[in-house]
């Protein structure tokens, strides 16, 4: 084994060296260095200002008259806003829109009270480039249309008539609309923290609920925030918090986000075609970045804090900024058990259930220089649930330490050391007890290289050590298993901008996992084509491997997964990782109608070597052997999924929202010769609608509010879908058992074909009737859950205490008009 591992590592090293030599041939750089200075009489001399790049979220502190510098990504539109830090609330804000044409450059600008002065960009002699800064209206021979017009600006006329030295008539919010290239990567959806807070119909701002609203993403029940993406299982989604794995980010009741939005920057979500940098999952990647605190304030220990009180939970957050250090910390706890006790006491409920959870989250960032940054984050979450005879507790810990260093204009280096923990206990009386503890230590490092025109290379190496301890006691069967695999990964990828309208991204990911002694290769490929200024087409495909899988005990919905790595059985059989081939395409069109964006996607995905779990009855001593590993009971299943998705959205104006439709089929088959079946998360069709109305507020509201920052909104979210699969039952019989001291009759229910039945269709409307407040100051909202009180099925079983056995269902959320939330910033 040691010789084999050495051979594999030598091969990986040669690959990395080869890629390094290949990309080191470069001579030109791709990023844009943006130098600026604020000279404006409306700001006080030496007043501290906050400069924010809205597209990237990058922010820095400066003062009037002091130069600042920031690195911008190439080939995109930027919005740069400058604000002061007036603690009275009378903030001044001035925003500029920049559009770059040409190749790489460094340019400078001075922001004044009446005009913007721009130096000529430094570009290669054979290439012409222009930088445009514009606000309310640029003075030129041809009029410049504002964003209220239905068509875009004629860029060629604008360049010919003013170019880089256009004069600004008034320094206000940007209203000029210019041509823009898509910034997001192929297969990626980007959701900002601000948009998550504005999501219609949510009782609390929720990262995962915002993802569930996307087409192709299935939420199986009200009681869980688990997601199923394009026919994949819940364990096939990779959750990353600052590059640390979070294994099972769920809270009971499904009303609360695991991650606190106050401490999160933008969320990146890949539901198809994620690049070679990400792996060990088959379906999707949800990447969250911890937010740096103090971006919108002067240097203070407690520059911004908030307290949030809702019907079931309370949350506190604070952030600050001193010198090169910035931080944000947040915590939350629930009192849902006390609320349920109160509801039971006054007769609103008859539910003997106790539940609680706690979350702690934070980020500390330190800038050693403009080129070197250290970032330490943490997330700790703990849950407990008691519902006699069921007892469960589980928790997640993720602690990543990352460093970023910009070596020069061509190279930048990233590294992360991460610790992740997931534990879970489940007991059902004295009949069953399952415990699992999973620890992982990971080291990740990667280099980005931009030294070749129109190429961005990324290559890196990862090493992860996992220790998983599993204990199970079920009737007469006892299993105790400890696994300690190492997982080595080397990858290389390139984003090649073939032309302004073609972006090709390709890569290769190499894996070696020690417990299963498995070497795997994952090729990835995607192509983005801009058909014209508003239309684009994305094509992607690839091969994906998953070395950490969940153990499924039932076909019906469960709250959590029990994770288990691929390994080697006691008889020497190597368990293969789950694998998948994915092929997908997506068409997008901005402004299909005025203000409406349209997307349509299709996909086909195969799945192989999926773990199935079944314990066979065995009266021998071997069934309780301490040498037994859990994988001895594994079988495998194969399957496929295919479908299409349609989406129409409107994000601006006095009303906003969207409608999504998806239709799909997912089929699996176990290798024991049984018939194909629908997996428990199969949802043939789903319709999702969200709608929000700005009744009163800023420029986009139906009525303008006299006081700046005030708003009053309402919103709703509707979902209609097929029910989840269930196994219907054919009948029952009496099993008579004669023991040494007793005689008993046991009713045994005879199941039919696996998942051949289906629950009733799902329908739910959530209404956020009141959403009122002042931006950055306070907010109050009132949400009604399940407005129509539709009875949605959650779990089905047969009560064998009655003859004949009675089919019994547990419902999901009823009509709940009590979701109140108040938030105050100080």
Predicted regions and their residues:
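Gram-negative outer-membrane beta-barrel transporters
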Residues: 499, 603-606, 628-723, 823
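Extracytoplasmic beta-strand/coil segments of soluble accessory domains associated
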Residues: 208-245
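A beta-strand signature from Gram-negative outer-membrane beta-barrel systems
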Residues: 214, 258-300, 304
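Outer membrane beta-barrel strand-and-loop segments of large Gram-negative receptors
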Residues: 442, 483, 489-491, 576, ...
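C-terminal beta-signal and adjacent terminal beta-strands/loops
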Residues: 707-712, 719-743, 764, 770-826
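Short, acidic, small-residue-rich periplasmic hinge/interaction motif at the N-terminus
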Residues: 110-138, 142-200, 234, 271, ...
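Short acidic/polar hinge/loop motifs at secondary-structure boundaries
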Residues: 198, 244-271
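Surface-exposed extracellular loop regions of Gram-negative outer-membrane beta-barrel proteins
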Residues: 423, 467-472, 514, 533-582, ...
């Amino acid at each position: 084994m040691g010789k084999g591992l050495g051979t594999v590592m030598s091969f990986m090293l040669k690959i990395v060296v080869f890629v390094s030599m290949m990309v080191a041939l470069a001579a030109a750089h791709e990023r844009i260095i943006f130098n600026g200075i604020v000279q404006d009489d409306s700001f006080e001399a030496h007043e501290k200002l906050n400069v924010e790049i809205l597209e990237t979220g990058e922010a820095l502190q400066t003062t009037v008259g002091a130069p600042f510098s920031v690195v911008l990504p190439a080939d995109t539109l930027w919005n740069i806003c400058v604000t002061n830090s007036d603690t009275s609330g009378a903030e001044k804000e001035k925003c500029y829109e920049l559009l770059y044409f040409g190749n790489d450059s460094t340019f400078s600008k001075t922001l004044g009270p009446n005009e913007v002065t721009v130096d000529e960009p430094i570009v290669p002699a054979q290439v012409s480039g222009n930088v445009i800064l514009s606000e309310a209206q640029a003075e030129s021979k041809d009029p410049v249309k504002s964003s209220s017009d239905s068509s875009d600006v004629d860029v060629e006329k604008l360049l010919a008539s003013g170019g880089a030295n256009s004069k600004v008539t008034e320094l206000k919010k940007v209203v000029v609309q210019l041509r823009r290239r898509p910034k997001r990567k192929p297969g990626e959806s980007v959701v900002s923290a601000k948009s998550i807070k504005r999501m219609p119909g949510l009782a609390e701002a929720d990262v995962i609920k915002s993802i569930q609203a996307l087409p192709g993403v299935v939420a199986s029940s009200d009681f869980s925030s688990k997601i199923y993406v394009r026919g994949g299982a819940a364990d096939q989604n990779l959750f990353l918090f600052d590059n640390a794995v979070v294994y099972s980010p769920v809270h009971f009741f499904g009303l609360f986000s695991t991650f606190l939005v106050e401490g999160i920057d933008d969320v990146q979500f890949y539901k198809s075609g994620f690049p070679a940098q990400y792996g060990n999952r088959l379906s999707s990647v949800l990447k969250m970045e911890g937010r740096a605190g103090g971006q919108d304030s002067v240097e203070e220990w407690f520059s911004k804090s908030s307290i949030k009180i809702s019907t079931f939970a309370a949350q506190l957050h604070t952030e600050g900024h001193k010198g090169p250090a910035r931080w944000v910390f947040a915590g939350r706890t629930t009192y849902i058990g006390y609320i349920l006790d109160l509801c039971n006491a006054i007769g609103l409920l008859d539910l003997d259930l106790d539940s609680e959870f706690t979350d702690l989250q934070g980020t500390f960032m330190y800038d050693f220089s403009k080129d070197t940054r250290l970032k330490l984050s943490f997330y700790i979450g703990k849950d407990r649930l008691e519902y006699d005879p069921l007892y469960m507790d589980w928790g997640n810990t993720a602690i990543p330490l990352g460093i970023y260093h910009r070596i020069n204009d061509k190279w930048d280096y990233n590294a992360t050391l991460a610790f992740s923990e997931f534990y879970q206990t489940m007991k059902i009386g004295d009949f069953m007890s399952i415990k699992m503890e999973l620890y992982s230590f990971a080291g990740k490092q990667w280099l980005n290289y931009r030294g070749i025109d129109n190429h961005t290379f990324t290559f890196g190496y990862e090493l992860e050590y996992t220790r998983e301890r599993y204990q199970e006691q079920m009737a007469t069967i006892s299993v105790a298993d400890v696994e300690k695999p190492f997982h080595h990964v080397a990858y290389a990828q390139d984003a090649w901008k073939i032309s302004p309208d073609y972006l090709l991204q390709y890569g290769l990911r190499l894996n070696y996992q020690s417990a299963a002694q498995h070497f795997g290769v994952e090729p990835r490929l995607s192509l983005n084509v801009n058909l014209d200024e508003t239309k684009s087409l994305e094509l992607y495909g690839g091969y994906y491997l998953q070395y950490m899988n969940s153990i499924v005990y039932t076909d019906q919905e469960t709250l959590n997964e029990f994770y288990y790595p691929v390994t080697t059985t006691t008889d020497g059989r190597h368990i293969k990782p789950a694998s998948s081939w994915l092929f997908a395409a997506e068409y997008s069109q901005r402004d299909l109608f005025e203000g409406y964006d349209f997307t349509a996607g299709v996909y086909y995905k195969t799945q192989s070597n999926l773990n199935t779990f079944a314990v066979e009855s065995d009266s021998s001593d071997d069934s309780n052997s301490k040498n037994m590993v859990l994988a001895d009971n594994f079988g495998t299943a194969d399957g496929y999924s295919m479908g299409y998705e349609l989406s129409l959205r409107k994000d601006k104006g006095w009303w906003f929202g969207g409608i999504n439709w998806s239709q799909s089929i997912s089929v699996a088959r176990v290798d024991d010769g049984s018939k194909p079946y629908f997996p428990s998360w199969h949802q043939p069709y789903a319709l999702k609608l969200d709608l929000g109305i700005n009744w009163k507020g800023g420029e986009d509201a139906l009525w303008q509010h006299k006081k700046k920052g005030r708003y009053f909104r309402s919103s709703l979210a509707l979902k209609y879908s097929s029910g989840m699969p269930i196994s219907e039952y054919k009948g029952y019989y009496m099993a008579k058992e004669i023991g040494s001291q007793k005689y008993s009759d046991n009713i045994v229910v005879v199941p039919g074909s696996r998942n051949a039945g289906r629950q009733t269709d799902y329908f739910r409307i959530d209404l956020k009737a009141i959403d009122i407040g002042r931006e950055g100051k306070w907010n109050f909202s009132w949400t009604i859950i399940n407005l129509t009180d539709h009875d949605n099925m959650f779990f089905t079983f047969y009560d064998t205490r009655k003859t004949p056995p009675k089919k019994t269902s547990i419902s999901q959320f009823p009509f709940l008009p009590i979701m109140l939330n108040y938030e105050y910033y100080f």
